[in-house]
């Protein structure tokens, strides 16, 4: 079983590790010693038998090792050795040899138990891996490595239980060596990988966290123990010593640790570890030190040999401790190992020996069984706790056990609490698999309170061992708290171990500790000191102390919430932390699992803030963990961020799992993480609190009641207490659960609920405009604020959190007497309150650091607190999604605190800012959690009143006091009545959700608030306008209704003028005060005024230099949002120039350099990673094209007419992806990400052009999805009007055109000046202006493909539809396009001369004339026709690449004199001019008449190319030859093709002479011709295979343009390109442009594809040897990615 376990572990680990390991693998190649380890391994096989992995896994392990060796190139030579190598990696083989007897003993002694362990582990790991496999390759690497390491310990622990001393020693040793050299290497590789992923947007963290979490869970207990012990012993301590975060990192901040390792490399890691070892018992450490030195220096072989020589090492005692924790080893060895490890860990000698391992042993065994049960479905569960420094494990009722297992066991299994968070995430993912289990988990975990008591006991015990390790350990322990994670519990649990509430606090403390582990060093001492108290968390989170007692519970809830949120940010820096927290949360949360507690949003907020802040780093905390927070924002916000990031990943998993209660709980945790930072120094997260609360409604209530006031009192701890927020959250959840149980009963149980799970929030994606206040400076600086907003944004839509705290606090103060103030403080950390959209989704986004109102009854109350968008009722919340914006500049932002609470005001006011300022001032720490919660916190949290009240009552009182700084909090229940500074909330009115929260001078952007109109849903979005530096999150434009409202509101063109006055909302609907405030702020925008026309979209126009805006609308996915935020932050930082935001579509316009993804990013969970990528891309693009991007927007005013499309027009450099990234879950993350990456490339290449394009793409996707689905239909017109007002055809076109918009360089400008742009300009809303679209004159992007594939609706501009070849943005947007492009890349590109307007979609039948064929494309349908699989590209492509009205497609009469020349076994179509494709010279486009299905009857499958696909290809500028089916189409099929290709409006009429059909080329062809790219996916059967010949759009475009006019005759069309299919069939693709143009004599040669397909490059003329312009290259990259997908099914899978 272990083998299986390990195999999965290794698999993920190796996979990611392998690339990195390969280099290390060279050093590692000292597998020659590994062959010696094989003997130990073989002798150890007994131990593997003990493990149940050696024998059982000899083959598996070998296989795994094969994988591993593949990954680890040095290992491949030894398969047998591989097995030893695996052991070696896992455990120093010398150790194994050393302990062969022990191993045998253990094996003999406990052979069957270990298999159980193994069984458990594999399941656990495999499940987590499955759930987190995404990240498996990235983060999991190191996670896997850690797992392996721990697993090695675990394995040794299992087998080494007999050989207690040796086993642990060996394990430890091996683990270390593995960790040091293997892991370090792996970390060098893996760590690098992790860093890469980290930079990638935390993809690894998100996925990897999931996977890591799972792995940690899987080996969690082992690893919990092992790692805890390792950390405590040598590994943990040395890790801690090397970097404070590491012990914690090991679990939650594993990344940080790994990072250090990667930095230190083997040596550094070894040194660190050795150092740690020195810290830990010397004998083992020394042994390890020398061993590791040898191991590292000589390579693993030597180390193995040495270890083999010295199997005597009693590291196994450590392992025993680990085994105890992991409950793998047998009692004896466990005792020895446990006591020994524990002693080592504590450095206390054998303090815990007898009891520790006795309890541990029992615990370990039971726990393992339990874990197995959970994963392996083994019913055994243990109650493990430390009493008097003794770890006691008691069998617990299996249900509890299951719960523990699931939550604690899995999480604790990977004792890294952060890893636990990962586990949590994995669990979420896995939970999906085991939802029933999850329910059990909830129950069990609730019963785990017992476990918490245990944990408390453990805490006492662990406390001793935990000092260096305490944070990390407690985190792990907490996860395992119920599990038997002694370590984590150590720090905090003690106080609140027993009572449920306490267990909540315990969890909270654990979580806090996790957080602390993030700030490990800082908290380390504190934790040890305060192990008993939440205080110890204070180090990390001021809240801890406050949270003690009830607060602790609250904190636990917060933790839970935090964890829940983890998903959103998990990928980010917070990943590990969140993992840890999540794990704890899982254990604790599950314990506290009270479906009623839905403060899931809270976590989102926290999550988001964490994410956005990269909470990873507390001020003290090491920021290694995720790249985000290296500055280590001080303030709890940091903590939150950490939690958030991890949280985010977890949330992602959670979202996937969507297991009922647990999901919700995790969000709690997230929230708690995010709030708890009040003081930079006290970063202990209060997240535990929320987590704790989460479990019980009553507990929550209690906590709320007691906590809220405490919060106020705690306030002193500036936000020390997240409790209030968490309480409120809990209350909200509670109420929500109770009240909304029917409505949001789901919520409690539902995936959707999991606020933490962005996936579910995706459901509410419309609402989900997260607001993240993010100060771009701050963000880059690791500002809590920035991150928080980002985090919030990314965290699913709960953006309430960040701003929530302040506003919430003030709101709470206003609404609830209770000191929501704390909330306010937290607000800063939980800048955004994400109104959870969708009812069930985390409704309670409220949490802003404790900002729930005291109203317990109102779940929403908590939400109200500040952005606590606590959708008290999820559903209500959903609409309510108000953007909470916290101002970036704490000082600047007077807390608009809706709450009339003086405190809230105070906090909100600059004064709070000041307090915040201290941290904020440096911007490095904008710790939201200042006592005042600082303006940022206050930003708006304006108390969202209770559930119902929330909308009403709170209405976002966020009035930002804007420049005036007067607190405009108008808390009125109707948020409608604008906040005083209406400006903050343009109009709080629900419809206006657009509240701009910008404060002019102050720059406080408090907008937020959704008001009660939440119900109206119309203004889901509360958009905050940020003035100079502050950034305002976009309001999420949720529904059509909102759209209309926004329409009206959108009137709110927030005109930013340089004048200091804040944004001026031109919104007609905006209340006067808004108007006034707006005026105040309107000047705020440094660069000209920006109008928000977009109705629904809540784009924030950022003005000032650095602020970033994240569209609030970002998909509910947390991750994505978080990524976006991070990107924004990065962009902001990099391009500090003023960036005008174009409000359009939820896109945030970043000031100059920064870019923001549209808020609209699709909510679909799948998008989360892609979004992140997008954002990163945006960031890159911004940086690269800072100037370029200035898009007319920078100096002048930029209006976004696109309603849904949230394109951000950055002022100069920033680029924003459209908010409209498709909601659809169909778009796979990868696709989106790829698209985004493509966008990145494109952006870089055509910075401005692409940048717009990317936005357009995103817009298109989202708009397509959102607008088409909801906006387009009802709100479409509204949006349209609003958005497109200048253009005249707004949304209808928008949806279609969205993608087109971004495509050209001009498009950026177009976005900015969509109205004015002529010719190719595409309006921001994605409709191409076509030739000059005067105010929407003539060119109506007529085709709006309903949010389905065509974002690219081609618009026939004026007379002809011109599709400007967009780089690939739309392609990017459309996964299909992407994949297509990738495929095309693989195939020779037919350069297509684009003389046809690229806007023509590939709709042959639908579009016969130049008018944009409005072919009905199913957005998610890859295949236009069921028979034509090739049209899989159709789905997401916004084909309407900017219609260049400039070029008209000359009508081409294709003569269908199709002569086939037989070459080889296939007929090749003679490139006759009659050939449609040839005549056009755009074989791909001609052939790729996606819409008109080109059927190759001869092949029996239709070659269908989606018009959409073609359009997007055109847009992409790449024409992929449509791969005809294996047999060249017969004349009949050709005629079909020609028919299909009928030139739209006769522009490029291709007629086959045979058919003499002068059918207008389908616009798709036209487009492809215009764009110079045609995708010719030919479906071999259902597979949509693109010829993969990418026509270089740019070049082809030019060629076509040149050629088409003259050469678009049948002769040109005649030219066909044949692609050899897998089936050994040649597909004829007619090159539209290759024939006529003699520029490049088309080579009829075939290019051999990787798939053994010949692609004929008939279009080479124009292609110029397939030289691709940058666009084409970008497209190629996308195409390569696409082409990698072998079949349309793949496309559809990813794209649908």
UniProtKB/Swiss-Prot annotation:
Provide the species name.
Arabidopsis thaliana (Mouse-ear cress)
What is the protein name for this chain? Uncharacterized protein At1g21580
Q: Is Phosphoprotein given among the entry's keywords?
A: yes
| Compositionally skewed regions (Low complexity) per UniProt | 96-113
Organism classification: Eukaryota, Viridiplantae, Streptophyta, Embryophyta, Tracheophyta
Which residues are modified to Phosphoserine?
378, 708
* Top-level taxonomic group: Eukaryota
Query: Polar residues composition bias: which ranges?
Result: 52-61, 170-183, 1389-1398, 1658-1667, 1677-1696
Annotated region Disordered: the residues are 1-113, 151-194, 258-284, 299-376, 419-483, 688-724, 1063-1090, 1184-1211, 1319-1340, 1361-1429, 1658-1696
Record field: compositional bias (Pro residues): 21-42
Q: Which UniProt keywords apply?
A: Phosphoprotein
Question: Compositionally biased, Basic and acidic residues: which spans?
Answer: 267-284, 325-340, 358-376, 421-436, 695-704, 1184-1204, 1361-1370
